């Protein structure tokens, strides 16, 4: 009982969080015995603490016992049976001792009490620590949490991929790991945008002092730092002047060793490091100080033998390293030592980065021996290869590209090198790509590159016996755009989202298209009939799978698009991936067909094979547009959506509106295209035009006259002239019945006059069509005579006068619309009209 009373008098008993907080609010050194409720405080140290109190007799020294089970702050100390003594200097942890080591306890308490007096009375910096054991536990927990989070993400990704696989339109999809953004984009057509407010990472500054630099410990210290998971953001060698050292350590100017410290820090070069950790850097200041260890080398060797100061320091002054003691101090020291350094922001915060594109050329000599190695280095440096092409330049092309260097000493050598073999042209993308690439390849002059940037591409892969370097890079945004256009001219291509993907994944595919840098110039939802589908796959006609392919393409809605970009044809085919989804999953796992394709027929997307094919098929599916030589798309109407509108009116005004409004493909060409032009196109069109005209004529011959009589006169007349091309839509049918035909009359009359001059050529181009049109004209005349009014009679006369022009126009309209094989039944006419629009 007396012993218990003595213990209570010597050590204040702390039983709850409130008492703990009150204890730590007191000034001075507090030695706390942390115990478990089931075993009680450590009785072995009572005599030692009593002796200390009696010998020292200092009011700033106090002792306490704290029950870990009832104090929230001590939660991590629960369940530990080893005696643990925490020492707090005015509420801040300054030391931890585990186990009963009387000499160490005695020595440490005396030293720490003396240091606390200096802190309180002289303003000396207090060294605050984190319990090393708890720090290790927290690091393990953090690693476990990160591993758990990664596993959770992996399982979520697998679940999402499984979800894709279970969808009817997705088929067998690769179960490779993909990013959250990729899955979200493919599944939902969305990506989470970055936050708008930038959050800087927490960083700290470390100086490797002159003694450690002189002793050759820099590389070993850096290796130790990296082993502990710290990221070194930048390094710099710096020799402080005495004035700089005095300013840097001004908080210590009242200490007796201050001048010695200043002289030492100015005695040789130091190594400055800026460190962070993880995505946010949170807690990096205290973690680095724990790694450095106590300032006093003897204490460090005794209490933290694995610390950097214990391993590399010499004495208290020459203790190898300096580390900032707070975030504020780190910011001040960084501004003093590295004023131009920009602290990185936490990923996912701040505005999205500005991505630039630049041109890179690998010249023939380096390409022949080092292609794969150089490409690997480029990708490892963070550049994304968006465009890639092997090019054999002619001398004229090389001189045109480098015309601004004409007259320089090495111009002829440069042209000789650029034409000596194939050049690899790359379109690279990265944040600040232009400047980053120029820094990566090094100075233009080889000697300068080897001296100032020995790790650069120009230094590593230089060509012997020449001053021509191995790589080229654009030097500005304007130059990059111009040079990319030289090697990767802007093109237009046709893209089709097939029925198996158009319903479920259309928006996701469009998002991927935009991410790849394509501009969608035109797009329409189209239900292809077999005739139009066959035009898309002419090259596969006769193959075993051809009929199944045509059946699939005409089985539902597709989306047809016109895409524009540098090297658009090859770029879209790369994004699509190989035709066989199984092969694509193995060789191009990020491609659309790898992710969404089922088999070679249901492989999600289609694209043109070359620019010429793209132009032909775009103009076939979008007859109201023209693909210009530079790849641009010219729309012949103000708005695509205007095609579906109906303009109703009477008289001359209504006729003019009707002429401008593209009610159908055949009508548009009939109203706007002269007969002479038709003849030329007919001749140039070659075999497809002839075949279409013939097929159209055969179908006209088979058409029963009685069926034509049941239709409005104007509609049948146009069918006669156009070889059954479905040029008349519902709007035109209504307009015809109401007598709105002046525009068509004017167009036909004009074509008749021109047709008199061009008639011989047109008769040679399409004899079958002309004969058919002549045979059908009487039937059309009889039908038109049933209409009331003088206007209808004039229409009939003009229709009879223009059989030759109608025949020529028919061939052109059929070729342009790609619908010469249409059946005359009304229901199918309507389907083809919807397809054309």
Swiss-Prot record:
Residues 493-629 are annotated as: NDK 3. Residues 201-345 are annotated as: NDK 1. One of its GO terms (molecular function) is 3'-5' exonuclease activity. InterPro entries: NDK-like_dom, NDK-like_dom_sf, Nucleoside_diP_kinase, Nucleoside_diP_kinase_AS, Thioredoxin-like_sf, Thioredoxin_CS, Thioredoxin_domain, TXND_domain-containing. Residues 671-707, 718-752, 766-787 have a biased composition (Low complexity). GO terms for biological process: cell differentiation; CTP biosynthetic process; GTP biosynthetic process; spermatogenesis; UTP biosynthetic process. Residues 805-819 have a biased composition (Gly residues). Its EC number is 3.1.-.-. Testis-specific. In sperm, it is a component of the arm dynein of sperm axoneme. Residues 638-647 have a biased composition (Polar residues). Residues 820-837 have a biased composition (Basic and acidic residues). Residues 633-837 are annotated as: Disordered. It comes from the Eukaryota. PROSITE patterns: NDPK, NDPK_LIKE, THIOREDOXIN_1. Disulfide bonds join 39-42. Residues 652-670 have a biased composition (Acidic residues). Residues 6-115 form the Thioredoxin domain. Residues 355-491 are annotated as: NDK 2. Pfam families: NDK (PF00334), Thioredoxin (PF00085). Keywords: Developmental protein, Differentiation, Disulfide bond, Hydrolase, Spermatogenesis. Probably required during the final stages of sperm tail maturation in the testis and/or epididymis, where extensive disulfide bonding of fibrous sheath (FS) proteins occurs. In vitro, it has neither nucleoside diphosphate kinase (NDPK) activity nor reducing activity on disulfide bonds. Exhibits a 3'-5' exonuclease activity with a preference for single-stranded DNA, suggesting roles in DNA proofreading and repair. Monomer. In the C-terminal section; belongs to the NDK family. Contains 3 inactive NDK domains that does not possess all residues considered to be crucial for the NDPK activity. This is Thioredoxin domain-containing protein 3 homolog. The lineage of its organism: Eukaryota, Metazoa, Echinodermata, Eleutherozoa, Echinozoa.
């Amino acid at each position: 009982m007396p012993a218990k009373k003595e213990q209570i008098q010597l050590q204040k008993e702390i039983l709850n969080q409130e008492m703990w907080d009150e204890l730590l609010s007191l000034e001075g050194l507090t030695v706390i015995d942390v115990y478990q409720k089931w075993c009680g405080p450590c009785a072995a140290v009572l005599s030692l603490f009593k002796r200390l109190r009696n010998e020292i007799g200092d009011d700033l020294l106090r002792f306490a016992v704290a029950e870990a089970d009832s104090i929230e702050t001590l939660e991590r100390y629960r369940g530990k049976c080893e005696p643990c003594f925490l020492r707090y200097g005015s509420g801040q942890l300054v030391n931890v001792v585990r186990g009963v080591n009387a000499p160490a306890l005695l020595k440490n308490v005396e030293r720490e009490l003396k240091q606390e007096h200096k802190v309180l009375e002289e303003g000396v910096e207090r060294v605050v620590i984190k319990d090393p054991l708890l720090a290790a536990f927290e690091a393990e927990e953090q690693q476990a949490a990160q591993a758990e989070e990664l596993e959770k993400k992996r399982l979520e990704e697998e679940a999402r991929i499984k979800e894709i696989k279970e969808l009817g339109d997705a088929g067998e999809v690769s179960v490779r790991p993909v990013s959250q953004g990729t899955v979200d984009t493919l599944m939902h057509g969305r990506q989470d945008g970055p936050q708008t407010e930038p959050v800087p990472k927490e960083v700290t500054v470390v100086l490797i002092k002159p003694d450690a630099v002189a002793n050759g410990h820099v590389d070993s210290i850096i290796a130790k730092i990296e082993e502990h998971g710290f990221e070194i953001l930048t390094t710099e060698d710096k020799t402080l002047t005495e004035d700089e050292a005095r300013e840097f350590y001004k908080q210590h100017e009242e200490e007796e060793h201050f001048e010695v410290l200043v002289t030492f820090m100015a005695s040789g070069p130091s190594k400055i490091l800026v460190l962070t950790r993880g995505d946010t850097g949170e807690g990096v200041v205290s973690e680095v100080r724990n790694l450095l260890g106590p300032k006093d080398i003897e204490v460090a060797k005794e209490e933290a033998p694995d610390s950097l100061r214990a391993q590399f320091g010499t004495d208290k002054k020459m203790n190898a390293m300096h580390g900032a003691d707070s975030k504020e101090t780190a910011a001040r020291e960084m501004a003093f030592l590295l004023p131009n350094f920009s602290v990185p922001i936490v990923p996912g915060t701040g505005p999205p980065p500005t991505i630039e594109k630049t041109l890179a050329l690998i010249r023939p000599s380096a390409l022949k021996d080092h292609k794969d190695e150089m490409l690997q280095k480029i990708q490892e440096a963070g550049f994304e290869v968006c465009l890639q092409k092997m090019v054999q330049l002619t001398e004229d092309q090389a001189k045109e590209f480098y015309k601004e260097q004409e007259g320089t000493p090495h111009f002829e050598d440069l042209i000789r090198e650029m034409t000596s073999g194939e050049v690899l042209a790359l379109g690279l993308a990265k944040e600040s790509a232009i400047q980053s690439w120029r820094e990566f390849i090094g100075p233009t002059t080889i000697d300068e590159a080897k001296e100032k940037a020995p790790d650069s591409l120009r230094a590593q892969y230089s060509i012997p016996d020449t001053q021509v370097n191995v790589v080229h890079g654009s030097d500005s945004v304007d130059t990059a755009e111009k040079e990319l256009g030289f090697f990767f001219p802007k093109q237009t291509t046709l893209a089709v989202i097939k029925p198996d993907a158009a319903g479920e994944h259309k928006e996701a595919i469009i998002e991927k298209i935009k991410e790849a840098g394509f501009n969608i110039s035109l797009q329409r939802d189209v239900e292809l009939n077999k005739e139009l589908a066959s035009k898309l796959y002419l090259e596969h006609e006769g193959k075993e799978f051809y009929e199944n392919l045509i059946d699939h393409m005409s089985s539902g809605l597709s989306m047809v698009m016109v895409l524009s970009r540098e090297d658009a044809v090859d770029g879209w085919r790369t994004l699509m991936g190989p035709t066989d989804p199984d092969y694509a999953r193995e060789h191009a796992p990020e491609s659309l067909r790898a992710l969404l394709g089922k088999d070679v027929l249901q492989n999600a997307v289609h694209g043109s094979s070359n620019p010429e094919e793209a132009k032909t098929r775009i103009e076939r599916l979008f007859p109201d547009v023209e693909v210009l030589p530079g790849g641009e798309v010219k729309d012949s109407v103000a708005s695509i959506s205007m095609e579906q509108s109906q303009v109703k009116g009477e008289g001359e005004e209504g006729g003019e509106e009707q002429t401008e409004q593209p009610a159908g493909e055949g009508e548009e060409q009939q109203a706007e295209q002269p007969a002479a032009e038709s003849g030329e196109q007919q001749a140039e069109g070659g075999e497809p035009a002839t075949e279409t005209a013939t097929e159209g004529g055969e179908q006209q011959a088979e058409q029963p006259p009685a069926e034509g009589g049941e239709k409005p006169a104007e509609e049948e007349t146009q069918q006669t002239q156009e070889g059954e091309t479905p040029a008349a839509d519902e709007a035109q049918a209504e307009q015809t019945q109401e007598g709105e035909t002046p525009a068509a009359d004017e167009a036909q009359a004009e074509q008749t006059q021109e047709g008199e001059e061009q008639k011989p050529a047109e008769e040679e181009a399409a004899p079958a069509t002309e004969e058919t049109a002549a045979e059908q004209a009487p039937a059309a005349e009889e039908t038109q005579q049933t209409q009331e009014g003088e206007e209808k009679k004039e229409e009939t006369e003009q229709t009879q006068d223009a059989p030759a022009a109608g025949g020529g126009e028919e061939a052109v309209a059929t070729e342009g619309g790609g619908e010469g094989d249409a059946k005359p039944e009304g229901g199918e006419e309507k389907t083809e009209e919807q397809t054309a629009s």
